[in-house]
């Protein structure tokens, strides 16, 4: 099992939680971004810089992920693709995407995108909060508790 992070838009506080979990549980963790990332020195944590371009980091994650891996992403289409491959997807606000909820999330995302394309002001997500950070940490801990210790 490996953790993959769609790192371009992942909040720094979430990356810090992931770094601590990777060290504590000794889980290989890979951050993928189209920009240079600083990661703590660790044999469990690495960063991969991909070329700039639309969904290049997403494509790399989809190509590399295997069943049972965990992908941290707020990108709903990416979450859908990794779930199809048998991996798990967790967003930075602590919501685990599943086969039961991903289709609804994707439909809502597409609907909102259509509204924005039509000129409707839809607003964005709420500011990232301490409650979001705690929800992510709790969900990550629950997920990792199910994985045998290395």
Swiss-Prot record:
Belongs to the UPF0178 family. This is UPF0178 protein Daro_2879.
